[in-house]
């Protein structure tokens, strides 16, 4: 199962399995003006099937970015730069999917990595060994099915530190991003910026090659805390009507998959402990302290 945990290290997720979190205005600075899988060997390829349909490396449809969406991205990028005090070195890469397409990508990406990482019989031996220790009680095939389904429903958006692409599901046939989609994109844009300030791909590859991930949890926790904080800043600019509208725009996520408890330890670490650690750092030195903790 360790290889699956390593796969999760590559993905920076906005969880869809947890309850909605409200922004905390009391923890925000007063000036909130806005200017507007481990897949280590996967090559990201965008293919054009015909004049109207573009697909990703797994043949899953990518939605077209309208001029209005591009302007919204520009505004959200400017907001992230303003709130973090940092600047993108290049325009962030992103893929937009339908919700079902995003879920298909999440499953396909995991299965692609699964085929590359596990030798014949290795997965079966790993699961049966854990069965002997009283951990999962499912068969190897059932456990694989559960993990694939978990990958499909576990996130509302993601950033992959290896190919440096943020991926977000949006509604089809709309010219502008709704508030829910913008909020998710803000979170992932922070990770995209972090990936440009730090060479996260090289950082991860070095850890994987040396089989030493000791430095990962601390930095990842702070990275999630910073992304959550900037997302909360953005949501704090919404009035009560817009907050209600954003809540109504959230897709009807269903994630009833139940995995062994230890599968959730990384999520608790990054999204619970990380948030508390980030708030402590931020309360002592504001965003500059978070940047220093991450980048120095």
Per-region residue spans from a language model:
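Post-HExxH zinc-binding segment in Zn-dependent metallohydrolases
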Residues: 76, 196-249
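Catalytic glutamate of the conserved HExxH
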Residues: 184, 188-196
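Bacterial signal peptide processing site
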Residues: 18-20
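Pan-zinc metallopeptidase signature
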Residues: 258-296
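Catalytic zinc-binding patch centered on the HExxH motif and its immediate surroundings
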Residues: 102-124, 141-166
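C-terminal motif of bacterial Sec signal peptides marking the signal peptidase cleavage site
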Residues: 13-16
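Short pre-active-site segment immediately N-terminal to the catalytic Zn-binding motif
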Residues: 153, 166-186, 218
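Extracellular mucin-like PTS domains
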Residues: 27-46
């Amino acid at each position: 199962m360790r290889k699956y945990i390593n796969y999760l290290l590559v993905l920076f997720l906005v969880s869809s399995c947890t309850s909605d979190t409200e922004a905390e205005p009391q923890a925000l600075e007063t000036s909130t003006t806005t200017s507007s899988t481990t897949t280590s060997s996967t090559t990201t390829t965008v293919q054009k099937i015909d004049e109207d349909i573009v697909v990703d490396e797994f043949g899953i449809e990518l939605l077209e970015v309208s001029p209005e969406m591009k302007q919204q991205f520009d505004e959200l990028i400017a907001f992230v730069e303003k709130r973090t005090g940092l600047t993108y070195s290049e325009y962030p890469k992103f893929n937009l999917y339908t919700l079902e397409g995003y879920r298909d990508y999440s499953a396909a990406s995991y299965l692609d990595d699964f085929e590359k990482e596990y030798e014949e019989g290795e997965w079966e031996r790993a699961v049966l060994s854990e069965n002997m220790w009283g951990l999962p009680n499912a068969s190897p095939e059932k456990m694989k099915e559960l993990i694939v389904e978990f990958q499909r429903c576990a996130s509302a958006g993601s950033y992959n530190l290896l190919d440096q692409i943020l991926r977000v599901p949006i509604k089809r046939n709309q010219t502008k991003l709704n508030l829910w989609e913008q909020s998710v994109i803000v979170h992932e844009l922070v990770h995209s910026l972090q990936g440009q300030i730090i060479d996260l791909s090289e950082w991860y590859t070095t850890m994987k090659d040396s089989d030493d991930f000791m430095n990962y949890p601390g930095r990842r926790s702070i990275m999630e805390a910073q992304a959550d904080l900037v997302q909360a800043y953005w949501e704090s600019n919404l009035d009560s009507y817009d907050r209600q509208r954003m809540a109504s725009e959230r897709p009807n996520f269903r994630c009833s998959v139940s995995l062994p408890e230890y599968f959730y330890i990384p999520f608790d670490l990054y999204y619970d402990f990380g948030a508390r650690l980030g708030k402590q750092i931020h309360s002592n030195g504001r965003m500059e302290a978070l940047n220093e903790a991450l980048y120095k």
